[in-house]
Amino acid sequence: MSNFDPDFSSYQLVILDYNGDRWPEKMEKSFLEFVKNGGGVVVYHAANNAFKDWEEYNRIIGFGGWGGREETAGPYIYRQDGYLKYDDKSSGCAGSHGCRHEFVLHCGNPEHPVTKGLPAAWLHAQDELYDRMRGTGIIKDVLFWGYSDPTTKGSGRDELVMFTVDYGKTRIFHTTLGHAGNSLDDNIAMQCAGFQVTLLRGAEWAATGQVTQPVPDNFPTETTISLRKNYK
């Protein structure tokens, strides 16, 4: 990473799918400048595991897990009785998930450009449902959430799955979906039409502030998953 120094200012959007060594200081400053100037950001799946000691990054991603995080990473953030809960400072891990399984996602804001026209509830293909996430960021819009069922070793809470983050004038879309396995056959979550469509819509919104993509006919329903095995 020591020689990696992309020119972020050349882009409208940065998609974060990285969970490794800390970036060089120059690169971190360049990224923060991009964000503060209004560049769009997508936080994808395990990117919220990265950089536990980078305070500004953790505000940008909203919440995070794993990577050595614990109580100092901030309170647990989840839904309770239909509202965001920010004040759960109880002890425990930061980041977990039960068995990979299918689960229903519920829309938290049907008028947001990313979710407008999508079903109020839809069944996602087998994936990790992140739970027990902690953070210091400001969650703006909960786009989709899912119940982390204890029968699949979940938290028993309504967990945020897709949301936006309030951070200056940038637009940030965070999705915890999309676990990638070691082979095409082990990438069921990424084959889900719901995952693909919401990622593309979230990326367009983060880059431009609007969504022009129509909802495809093969979007999942509340009871039926929909796979695009060729990723198209």
Regions of interest found by a model, annotated:
Residues 7-14:
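Short acidic/histidine-rich motifs immediately flanking catalytic phosphotransfer sites
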Residues 21-113:
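A glycine-rich, often tryptophan-bearing local segment used as a flexible ligand/cofactor-contacting loop or short
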Residues 58-60, 107, 120-126, 130-138, ...:
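Oxidoreductase and adenylate-handling cofactor-binding alpha/beta cores
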Residues 1-5, 29, 156-162:
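Alpha-helical scaffolding within the catalytic cores
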Residues 79-171:
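Catalytic beta-strand/loop cores that center a nucleophilic Ser/Cys/Thr
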Residues 1-2, 19-23, 41, 47-51, ...:
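Solvent-exposed loop/turn segments at secondary-structure junctions
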